[in-house]
Amino acid sequence: MLDVNNFEYMNIGLASPDKIRSWSFGEVKKPETINYRTLKPEKDGLFCERIFGPTKDWECHCGKYKRVRYKGVVCDRCGVEVTRAKVRRERMGHIELAAPVSHIWYFKGIPSRMGLVLDMSPRALEEVIYFASYVVTDPANTPLEKKQLLSEKEYRAYLDKYGNKFQASMGAEAINKLLQDIDLVKEVDMLKEELKTSQGQRRTRAIKRLEVLEAFRNSGNKPSWMILDVLPVIPPELRPMVQLDGGRFATSDLNDLYRRVINRNNRLKRLLDLGAPSIIVQNEKRMLQEAVDALIDNGRRGRPVTGPGNRPLKSLSHMLKGKQGRFRQNLLGKRVDYSGRSVIVVGPHLKMYQCGLPKEMALELFKPFVMKELVEKGLAHNIKSAKRKIERVQPEVWDVLESVIKEHPVLLNRAPTLHRLGIQAFEPTLVEGRAIRLHPLVCTAYNADFDGDQMAVHVPLSAEAQAEARILMLAAQNILNPKDGKPVVTPSQDMVLGNYYLTLERAGAVGEGMVFKNTDEALLAYQNGYVHLHTRVAVAANSLKNVTFTEEQRSKLLITTVGKLVFNEILPESFPYMNEPTKSNIEEKTPDRFFLDKGADVKAVIAEQPINAPFKKGILGKIIAEIFKRFHITETSKMLDRMKNLGFRYSTKAGITVGVSDIVVLDDKQEILEEAQSKVDNVLKQFRRGLITEEERYERVISIWSSAKDVIQGKLMKSLDEVNPIYMMSDSGARGNASNFTQLAGMRGLMANPAGRIIELPIKSSFREGLTVLEYFISTHGARKGLADTALKTADSGYLTRRLVDVAQDVIIRETDCGTDRGILAKPLKEGTEIIERLEERLIGRFARKQIKHPETGAVLINENELIDEDKALEIVEAGIEEVWIRSAFTCNTPHGVCKRCYGRNLATGTDVEVGEAVGIIAAQSIGEPGTQLTMRTFHTGGVAGDDITQGLPRIQELFEARNPKGQATISEIDGTIAEINEVRDKQQEIVVQGAVETRSYTAPYNSRLKVAEGDQITRGQVLTEGSIDPKELLKVTDLTTVQEYLLHEVQKVYRMQGVEIGDKHVEVMVRQMLRKVRVIDAGDTDVLPGTLLDIHQFTEANKKVLLEGNRPATGRPVLLGITKASLETDSFLSAASFQETTRVLTDAAIKGKRDELLGLKENVIIGKLVPAGTGMMNYRKVKPVSNVQPTEDMVPAE
């Protein structure tokens, strides 16, 4: 057998008849499968053991030779070779066809490849192949033309007239003759001449033909191989036949299809031997052609062949296609051993890097390890008895299991895995019961909750896999979210509430103004009821371990609360003492106003001080981010565990809970509603008098009720007590918001109907009062729409992620520096006047393209190719610089990837990105994962027609697929001035742009809003009317940079409007993939073909070559492809075929004789190699793990 895992590349091509025969181990002559009595394969049939190998290991068909000692012997009685039965998975057979047939992929595809080679229409081809017309194959010296079609009648007439002077025939034989007559070199030269003169349709056709003919010429495939003389039969184990319980057989559809081919082939042979009339023979040949078509691609032409119950049979093509096909089901979706799944429950006692694994599950998963250990410890004599011990669950097994799982990480995964944090490593601890215990802080990353979610466990087996899991995937290492570099493990719900309650301050609480010598004394007083957690007290500053106090502060008393003393115990000693939720307190030091001299009147000072806000969810997030920045991963994960414990403990102690009595109903609600109602009546009066239109009336009613609800909401919030549990939950960010509260205690407000239009009848009741039947009915609309939307959105968003991953899967960091001298100009992203993304956000973690100097002092702030970190970015912004040249993935020169400098910092680790990081997949996941949070709706603004702006998910799809947007804007194609704006017929507006050389006029629909006025100076690509620009148009008019910036800006706009932050670099990686291709306009002296799509790198290489020889380079224009199109245009045919349109991709690749260099991740997964990213890259492959080595001095890197 060939070494399956070690090859450099993979080729695909057409198989010649000789090639097919060389694969084969024998000819299948009979349609029989197995003998119904003996259940053994029939000789020469579809399962024949002589051709395909024995059905049982080391045993021939007749039983003369049994056992392995006869290995390689061919039985003299039955002719079966004695070998392993698994050869039946790889040995092929063949069928010698009595008449040639055409391969349906090449004849039926779009465009028809056979048609292009022969310059015949697919209609004509079909008539010939299916025996409806004759085609002239050799006109000799008659007036007929080669490739001319003749009907039966015409053929007879010409035969009478010219006799045997000319030759015409039908079927695939005729096509085969024509294909063999083609002289590729001559045809290609003729077409190249034709291209120089022709225009329009003829030119397009010529380009298409040239492409196919060149492909044949360069690949070494012969056109006549598109016609099959011999048909390969795939190995029987790949089209199995199994016996069911009832004694019946279930078989693969392929066997039926093969059987039809063999039957028709044998009948045709018999008819030819008998010398049957030509009409019968022709009919049989046509049926054979149809049988082969059905086998290769059933249903491509005519009605599909059906099995029992009118179900179309699955042909060879269907075996590859779609989600259930070979590619996506078996090659990219393999199931793995050593895995299990169970329900998850919360494990609040766990450390960040731990998970609880049920005992029985762990025993099953680690069985082989336990067996080995049992034997090594002498508790079992051999593997068999060890296995028996485990199956009987004897007591000593548990001790061994404990020692085996120690420091052996497992992977936990929750479906759907939307980003890389959906699968993380943990150290297992054994737990009773049957549920997996999950650490509460990783729930955000998994998007898990404990209402019945299930998770899967996988065991990394090899030492390398364990090391990778521990170093790269351990939950304690994955604190930052790859999409924006912010911590993903912020506390939530109970934990937030506990810490909020702990840090509350209350004026006049019990024991206010007491002075303590240290924390312990304060806690003692709290436990004995002398002070409360919320009491403001004073503590000697020098008793606290905090290092950040200044000398002056140390000598004084610190004013704080007992709760804050407890809270600060969990922070590192060199972190400022947190006394108020402000940026300066987190980043610099505790403000001086909290310190007072010893001997001062503490109570009086405290009474004058304002109350400080407690620590809400956002502040906790900022504290975590700051700790991560200063102390790095290990310290952060320890601190997070402490914060979690504190939160749970104090939310339990606080006993915060919700009762009906906590929902306080507003007293003057009725008056507000009556006032609103009278305003609505007024509006109605105006409408009835014809003073306002229906549309205006509707708008006004809606706005009256909305403002009434706002008034109620405002009053409610004011009337709430600080310690009201509902208020605390919403204020702390634990659960709920002001709107939820308004619905509970105020009014539910306006609802939308199923079409998304707001119903003008508001729900005046609140949940506390109860809804009337009508109100209840109205609110069901909204609820149902919400659920339906969510279901649709999930599928849409998942499909978007799949396309994004597919287009960017081969983008890997391949080198340190590509040496480019280009970059992009980073400015703040604005929408109108509102800043969507600040300049410093765009700069952090990027490399500077040019040296940046302070505009006033001239001091160098940052050098060329230097990393801009948080502090440097702040310096740049504070210096008043508004735009900065930075390195970007847009301008990176690395083929098949990006370089470290152009990419910048890895957001997930906060450090430089490593060579080998799969940044393409990370980018795709970062954009796709928040997809479910985006809205589905198209917003209707004020009912102005033609003004529906697409937002949310549909807009993202529109941008990445480069579709013509809804509500398209008109853009100017030239620089110039707006000369005039006129109204023309049909209420349209005409905008005349006067340039230096030419004048252009644009018409815009009557109701579109203009963005320009007469006399304005405009540049090419500028918008004239409101709406979204079509990026393809923009590319025609302007340059690459403009389009890149536009796409980046638009994508960011959609996400930021929904409150989702995504790093620019992710969008850059995706947009770069969409702009990778160039359409060749003029080939110059290169050997590229005009009209073809080429990768930018291939294009520049080809040009470099001719320029060095002093010849004319090719010219091309960049093309913007949508992500689906871009993934199908990738260089790797394996990746493209496993994505969509499998047959088209493979047909094309086979004709071109494509070679897949296996550069991306997908191709390597498909063929079962390690992916060429991360530790799978060539330079890491040489690293071998060594077990149990004691570390020495020289192993430890210097700090």
From Swiss-Prot:
Domain of life: Bacteria
Residues holding Zn(2+) 2: C818, C892, C899, C902
An annotated GO cellular component: DNA-directed RNA polymerase complex
Cofactor entry: Mg(2+); Zn(2+)
Reactions catalysed, as given in the entry: RNA(n) + a ribonucleoside 5'-triphosphate = RNA(n+1) + diphosphate
Cofactor binding description: Binds 1 Mg(2+) ion per subunit. Binds 2 Zn(2+) ions per subunit.
Residues engaged in binding Mg(2+): D449, D451, D453
Major enzyme class: transferase
Presence of the UniProt keyword ATP-binding in the record: no
Purpose of the protein: DNA-dependent RNA polymerase catalyzes the transcription of DNA into RNA using the four ribonucleoside triphosphates as substrates.
Name of the protein this chain belongs to: DNA-directed RNA polymerase subunit beta'
Source organism of this protein record: Bacillus velezensis (strain DSM 23117 / BGSC 10A6 / LMG 26770 / FZB42)
Classification lineage: Bacteria, Bacillati, Bacillota, Bacilli, Bacillales
